[in-house]
């Protein structure tokens, strides 16, 4: 069992006084696999003050100094990918061979490599006539991250913050805290200066809220639910600090009538079920021509039944458990709601898959004949539940897609790239994937509407951690 009860504050591993202990549960076995400490406002204050003391020195380091440290982090990270992947599998259930090793752990490394690449070529100053425009580190940052892609979400914040010259306090999810602890070890090993990076475990009320509210925190970057994001914004408001939010989604996957139907449905089902549906940008609404609904249902059922649910340590497992008992119950409630509202259940349903007597395993579930008024069409379920929604024409498909309080991602499949591009222009989302295109580490990630504000990834995420200063008369008259 992992004993991760220490915090990392001011370059030291410290056992926090007065902190409660919390058990970390392996969602595949429902057994205790670790212990952490739940911090308090006092621990947050210690970490923030350490970050504040470190800021003046770290913010004045040269680009080359920060780049050298980032490159050391990348080398150390790469050497520990297997260890990190196993920790992710243990803490939140991602299948080791098919997800944690090829995607979850390398995604974290990818953000550090991208941050180093951006920093290498980034110009922090530019001239506008006699005025000099300077980009400077934003300050002390409070970083609050979720459990679904634990290290990916951490690295998407920590890497650009380090590159920009900020100092920080990280609060990872108490449900999946192992990979954050391993990253702190890497920082300690490579010699990140004391106070530049601090780790305080805890829950939202005990650590997240005081971190967002702390007067010495200049910027808060939060990824999680829209409900929690509003609480973070409220806590941060009295100090008028910058707040960047990456929140929920209910992404539409528009399959146009000229698309390769089998390819589009297969990709849509598999992408939806990836990570057991626990991705904010999951294509959870599949919009299909009414004339092809029967064929889509047949294909979707076929591809759904191919998915292997089981022990995340087995190499043939496609999807593992949901990350917690609470999430399992939420998904079950949503499936019940779909049945009660009269949606057509074509695959899956309530309870665990056959042969799995324990663990937070849910059946990959597909509903069809879903309309936009139904709860399952509007709620972010965050589990392996796909809604198939028929439309009459392209304009109606776009209207259905945009009829959501969320606006994180969209997906379009078409035999005509030009047609797909035209639909993409009309979607009110922060990203659109055309014909199965993958995510891009250099592209911005973030949403419209209640999916949040600000952007992560690439230079766009890097610039979130910079302030802009205008120095007039810099060149003289």
UniProtKB/Swiss-Prot annotation:
Its EC number is 1.2.1.83. The keyword Oxidoreductase applies. Pathway: Alkaloid degradation; nicotine degradation. It catalyses: 4-oxo-4-(pyridin-3-yl)butanal + NADP(+) + H2O = 4-oxo-4-(pyridin-3-yl)butanoate + NADPH + 2 H(+). The active site is at 246, 280. Keywords: NADP, Oxidoreductase. The keyword Thylakoid does not apply. NAD(+) binds at residues 202-208. It is an enzyme of class 1 (oxidoreductase). One of its GO terms (biological process) is nicotine catabolic process. It holds the Pfam family Aldedh. InterPro entries: Ald_DH/histidinol_DH, Ald_DH_C, Ald_DH_CS_GLU, Ald_DH_N, Aldehyde_DH_dom. It comes from the Bacteria. GO terms for molecular function: oxidoreductase activity, acting on the aldehyde or oxo group of donors, NAD or NADP as acceptor. Catalyzes the dehydrogenation of 3-succinoylsemialdehyde-pyridine to 3-succinoyl-pyridine in the nicotine degradation pathway. Belongs to the aldehyde dehydrogenase family. This is 3-succinoylsemialdehyde-pyridine dehydrogenase. The gene is ald.
